[in-house]
Amino acid sequence: MSYFIDTSILGRLANASDVQHTVATRAVLELHRRGEGLHVAPQVMIEFRNVATRPVAVNGLGLSTADTETLAATFEARFSLLPETPDIYPAWKALVGTLGVIGKRVHDARLVAVCHVHAVTHLLTFNVGHFTGMAGFRPGVVVVDPTSV
């Protein structure tokens, strides 16, 4: 199996004081122990930089750009970075068009499309509800809450 690591996981891994830090860490370590493929996409790394450098007062981590770059480099070394390919846009377009995905969820739909194009079978996220209804869109992806790993 292979697992796509969502931005919500990276944010918790980066913040040791977050109440879900331990859950995220244990889930990733367990998947690694099992020999599962662990992947991120450029979109997730971009979203991570957004959250990491955003002030704490507006739901960010409040990290410096230097600290953010160090963490991003660690994540890029730990997780396989899936390439952007021309097949992602048509897969995303089919998903949002068929399911009528709108608003902020179009970004989540793109992550599902990345999983489809790269044959990633599972998506690890704290935001399971964001992917409701999209996971079953063929070829499908299993959305996994880290507490269940």
Positions of the model-derived regions?
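Active-site neighborhoods of divalent-metal-dependent phosphate/nucleic-acid chemistry enzymes
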Residues: 80-128
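Conserved glycosyltransferase catalytic-site signature
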Residues: 7, 42, 105-109
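Active-site-proximal, substrate-binding regions of enzyme catalytic domains
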Residues: 52-80, 86-88, 92
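Hydrophobic helix-cap positions at the C-terminus of alpha-helices
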Residues: 30-31, 75, 95, 99, ...
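Short, well-structured N-terminal submotif of metal-dependent ribonuclease cores
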Residues: 1-40, 57-66, 70, 133, ...
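Acidic, PIN/NYN-like endoribonuclease modules and their adjacent C-terminal/linker elements
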Residues: 2, 109-149
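Short beta-strand segments at enzyme active-site cores
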Residues: 39-42, 125
